Amino acid sequence: MRWITRPGWPGNLLALAAGASTLLALAPFDIWPLALLSIAVLYLGLRELTPRQAMWRGWCFGFGLYGAGTWWIYVSMNTYGGASPLLAIVLLLAFFAALAWFFALPTWLWARWLRRNEAPLADALCFAALWLLQEAFRGWFLTGFPWLYAGYSQLDGPLAGLAPLGGVWLISFTLALSAALLCNLHRLRARPSFLAVAGVLLLAPWLLGMALKGHAWTKPAGDPLKVAAIQGNVEQEVKWDPAHIDAQLALYRDMTFTSKPVDLLIWPETAVPVLKDQAQGYIDVMGRFAAERHSALITGVPVREVVHHQRRYYNGITVTGEGDGTYLKQKLVPFGEYVPLQDMLRGAIEFFNLPMSDFARGPEDQPLLQAKGYQIAPYICYEVVYPEFAASLAARSDLLLTISNDTWFGTSIGPLQHLQMAQMRALEAGRWMIRATNNGITALIDPFGRITTQIPQFQQAVLYGEVVPMQQLTPYLQWRSWPLAILCVLLLGWALLAGRIAKTV
């Protein structure tokens, strides 16, 4: 097994396979031990490499992770973006190759400045700190792509109880630390005191996670609310076709008129496929219907505003009936809602000129939505995958709501991964999450991240259920990731500036 730690393609191919295997730790497969194993394989493989060799090994790991975990983007490019199969594959490989640098650069940094082979305990701690910072960095750089975090593997695993303490990143940190410690236990046998410390660091988080799993950090703020989420299952090919707009509006109107009386009526992202000011008459009619039923209707709708004599378009969500508020999406999907380097790319191929791909970013510090006397934190599609952003809204809310249109990804696993991240947000916040989508998966999620009810994908249907407004804050909503970030910076600073001290550990 020495070839694992040595340079060369055998080790690089193993790193590629380890990255790819992470997919199986996440939804819909949920074989969570593979997340631990894949990190351990990468960690072991960096032990004897030069910085340049470590960089390429990390790149192989990242390419495997994104290649296996986000292949479903091909559906958007080919089926809906107009790219030929060959062009879609080329673009996708370039995308994977670029994202792989999120792992290549940290592994270079690790081998160049931070690795302490002679100090296994310090080595494991610093590796976990660097792992956390790379996850945070890829959720921030160039607006971020916070997909495939290792911590999501634990939604139903032993570490789930840590999510309300420190979010998905605390779980990722624990997985990386555990993987590195397991790889180093045999090297600590000659030093019983340090072996004991390693044992505590290894076991304590897992025992704590299991002990806190199911612990209620929040409590009800009122009586249960009845919910109806409308899943229209509108085909993406006709979504923005002017010839089909009236039919879509009639579909949601009729499904709502025939639905059971509830407190909250939820329509998915851009259920109203015309600008809000153009559809205001229709929205008012639906609002009066909702008010007569003592309901609030919440729907996705694009919004047009004039700012400094310039028109701006937003992906929005609005409330009518017994509620109020309009929210404008802040976290936009690259190429789907805006085109990076648009002067160069816009119009080059159909994929860079998708309908409604010129949205502006909504302002920060927007008020939450109000419905039935409660504050609702809104997340439009992609926004729910950002842990810190989601927490900033959840801390002011009684309920969480995410609306989405995952039709772009066909029958792939992309929507299942998306749902898993929404479940983690509910667990982190200790709040109920309503998830309404165009074609699935529409679901209600309880404060422990469990799906209480859902309806099948690819069907026109109405989901009925109850949610409970919640009050009080989980530790994660109070402190976010600041304590963990400070710990990681201190650990890495110690490794950089006090290498001699690390050698004695």
For each of these PLM feature ranges, what is it?
Residues M1-A216, T411, A422-R425, T437-F448, ...:
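Membrane-embedded alpha-helical bundles of multi-pass enzymes
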Residues L26-V41, L65-W72, Q231-N233, P261-V274, ...:
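Short, conserved active-site loops that position catalytic residues or coordinate cofactors/metal ions
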Residues I89-F96, V234-W240, F351:
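Short glycine/proline- and acidic residue-enriched helix-loop micro-motifs
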Residues R116, L188, T258-S259, E292, ...:
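Alpha-helix C-cap/termination motif
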Residues H244-A250, L265-V505:
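Solvent-exposed soluble domains appended to multi-pass membrane proteins
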